[in-house]
């Protein structure tokens, strides 16, 4: 069951006072947060549909809030000291176990004898880190397969830095990590001791080498540890399983699905794209008396011939099994969608957390293949009441039948205030971004000119500064004003976009970000054309 449709998950009402929307403001309602992209732009927690990249901590008890502050003073310092000492202990055990060994030695054969025992001691030290960090209870369900039965552990959902507790509690198994990880102070030695499979990002053959290493370990007669892979590739809020990256499934070997659950009263450790930062999460997690983690091993999944030949099919089928066991839907969202949302946020696009759903709805309406947004953009400043459009006017402007359900969905996605109205500017910014997200910033800025100025040849200072806010966060107000004055050498009070382009071309080393194309983002189906005047 795949979901990408509007689905209420918390009602349309703003939560009552006392609900924590931002971890820094305990006891303060913060369902809606003002962004600085436009006056009429808001970002909400995405309760129109299941958005796996949004998380809010809801603590509605004044007693609980008081407890957090009391334990911050009485318990948190002790826990921090305990975590640090445990980490140092684990590092010391790892250093002893690695004495006289190189990375090549670790890659050549599995650890045996006393080095294997020291590896267990290192894992115990890391387990104490989590114990001091409030995770006193880790429940194991199901039977953990051996490395010969399932060389790969596919873990989901991936929602937090705490998920690494699985590595500590399960052996430890190996992980797939960037080569640079080995150089991290303290943790680098500990990770090395788990005999990870390192990925060389600068090597174009890195993926094939990683697959070969996994297959070699699986077929070896030596006692290699299993390899843990978080198949989602990014953190989610556990409301749905997003698309699995196929890396764990390319080798075509049996895998064991592993579920991570956190049956606690408050979710203070989910770390998503739109949510509390890691330090705030650590603070709230370590000021609980204790937290629970549940690790469930599902039966080994042996791929069919079709699945061995098609890693994506294999990944999707394993995901369905895990979603059914968790009782959650699967989602069309993927790691690449996080890249799109991050780019939208950097470019001050309204509702960046919803931009993927907005794009899908625009495509269903066929607006991605039309030039209606460019036409509306060109005449935008001559329109009235564009910040308060009802559904009828909105449909007429888009030239879409009012009976079209996707029009109503798009309207709901843009109506974060639940006022029954939407902003035309917000829609145009979203629509143009969806079409031009693979283009360079200069092309995108050119498409937005008429949202701020009647003519591309006479852009006043205020309009120029507002336009530059969409330059990926590289040109703040102070820099944009300085750039305007550098262009307006004759003190006319306005500049042309062409003069701006000319200056950036002459100083391309300073403005190379304007010419960079994000080829890794999904390509749009159509390209928008814009008029200059």
UniProtKB/Swiss-Prot annotation:
Consequence of gene loss (knockout): RNAi-mediated knockdown in larvae increases lipid droplet size and reduces lipid droplet number in fat bodies.
Domain of life: Eukaryota
Domain annotation EF-hand: ranges: 402-437, 439-474, 475-510
GO BP: lipid modification; phospholipid biosynthetic process
GO cellular component, one term: endoplasmic reticulum membrane
Single GO MF annotation: 1-acylglycerophosphocholine O-acyltransferase activity
Cytoplasmic side: 1-79
Pathway named in the protein's UniProt entry: Lipid metabolism; phospholipid metabolism
Bilayer-spanning residue ranges: 80-100
Motif (HXXXXD motif): 158-163
Alphabetical UniProt keywords: Acyltransferase, Calcium, Endoplasmic reticulum, Golgi apparatus, Lipid biosynthesis, Lipid droplet, Lipid metabolism, Membrane, Phospholipid biosynthesis, Phospholipid metabolism, Repeat, Signal-anchor, Transferase, Transmembrane, Transmembrane helix
Membrane topology: Single-pass type II membrane protein
Catalytic activity: a 1-acyl-sn-glycero-3-phosphocholine + an acyl-CoA = a 1,2-diacyl-sn-glycero-3-phosphocholine + CoA
CDD domains in the record: LPLAT_LPCAT1-like
Matching SUPFAM superfamilies: EF-hand, Glycerol-3-phosphate (1)-acyltransferase
Record EC number: 2.3.1.23
PROSITE patterns: EF_HAND_2
Entry-linked InterPro entries: EF-hand-dom_pair, EF_hand_dom, LPCAT1-like, Plipid/glycerol_acylTrfase
Functional description taken from the UniProt entry: Acetyltransferase which mediates the conversion of 1-acyl-sn-glycero-3-phosphocholine (LPC) into phosphatidylcholine (PC). Has a calcium-independent activity. Displays a clear preference for saturated fatty acyl-CoAs, and 1-myristoyl or 1-palmitoyl LPC as acyl donors and acceptors, respectively. Involved in the regulation of lipid droplet number and size.
Similarity comment: Belongs to the 1-acyl-sn-glycerol-3-phosphate acyltransferase family.
Free-text comment on this protein's domains from its UniProt entry: The HXXXXD motif is essential for acyltransferase activity and may constitute the binding site for the phosphate moiety of the glycerol-3-phosphocholine.
Protein name in the entry: Lysophosphatidylcholine acyltransferase
The organism of origin for this protein: Drosophila melanogaster (Fruit fly)
Gene name in the database record: LPCAT
């Amino acid at each position: 069951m795949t979901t990408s449709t509007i689905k209420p998950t918390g009602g349309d009402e703003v939560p009552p006072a006392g609900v924590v929307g931002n971890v820094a403001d305990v006891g303060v309602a913060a369902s809606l947060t003002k962004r600085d992209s436009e006056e009429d732009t808001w970002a909400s927690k995405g309760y129109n549909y299941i958005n796996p990249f949004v998380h809010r901590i809801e603590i509605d008890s004044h007693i609980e809030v008081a407890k957090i502050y009391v334990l911050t003073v009485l318990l948190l310092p002790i826990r921090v000291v305990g975590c640090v000492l445990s980490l140092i202990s684990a590092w010391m055990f790892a250093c002893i176990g690695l004495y006289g060994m190189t990375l090549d030695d670790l890659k050549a054969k599995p650890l045996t004898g006393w080095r294997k025992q020291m590896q267990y001691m290192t894992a115990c030290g890391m387990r104490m880190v989590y114990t001091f960090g409030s995770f006193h209870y880790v429940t194991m369900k199901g039977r953990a397969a051996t490395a010969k039965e399932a060389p790969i552990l596919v873990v989901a959902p991936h929602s937090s830095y705490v998920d690494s507790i699985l590595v500590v509690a399960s052996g430890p198994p190996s992980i797939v990590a960037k080569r640079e990880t080995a150089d991290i102070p303290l943790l680098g030695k500990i990770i090395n001791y788990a005999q990870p499979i390192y990925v060389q990002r600068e090597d174009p053959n890195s993926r094939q080498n990683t697959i070969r290493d996994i297959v070699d370990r699986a077929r070896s007669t030596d006692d290699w540890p299993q390899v843990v892979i978080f198949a989602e590739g990014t953190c989610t809020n556990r409301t749905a399983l997003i698309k699995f990256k196929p890396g764990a499934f390319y080798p075509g070997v049996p895998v064991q699905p592993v579920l991570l659950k956190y049956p606690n009263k408050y979710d203070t450790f989910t770390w998503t794209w739109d949510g509390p930062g890691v330090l705030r999460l650590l603070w709230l997690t370590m000021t609980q008396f204790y937290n629970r983690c549940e690790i469930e091993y599902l039966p080994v999944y042996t791929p069919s011939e079709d699945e061995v030949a098609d890693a994506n099919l294999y990944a999707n089928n394993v995901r369905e099994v895990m979603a059914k066991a968790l009782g959650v839907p699967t989602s069309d969202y993927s790691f690449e969608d996080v890249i799109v949302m991050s780019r939208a946020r950097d470019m001050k696009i309204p509702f960046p957390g919803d931009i993927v759903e907005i794009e899908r709805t625009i495509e269903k309406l066929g607006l991605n293949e039309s030039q209606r947004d460019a036409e509306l953009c060109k005449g935008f400043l001559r329109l009235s009441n564009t910040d308060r459009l009802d559904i009828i006017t909105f449909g007429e402007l888009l030239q879409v039948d009012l009976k079209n359900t996707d029009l109503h969905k798009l309207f709901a996605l843009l109506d974060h205030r639940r006022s029954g109205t939407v902003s035309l500017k917000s829609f145009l910014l979203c629509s143009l971004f969806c079409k031009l997200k693979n283009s360079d910033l200069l092309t995108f800025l050119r498409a937005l000119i008429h949202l701020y100025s009647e003519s591309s040849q006479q852009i006043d200072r205020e309009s120029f500064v507002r336009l530059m806010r969409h330059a990926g966060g590289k040109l703040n107000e102070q820099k944009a004003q300085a750039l305007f004055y550098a262009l307006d050498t004759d003190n006319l009070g306005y500049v042309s976009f062409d003069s701006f382009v000319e200056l950036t071309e002459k100083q391309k080393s300073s403005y190379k970000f304007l010419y960079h194309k994000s080829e890794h983002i999904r390509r749009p189906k159509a390209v928008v054309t814009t008029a200059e005047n």
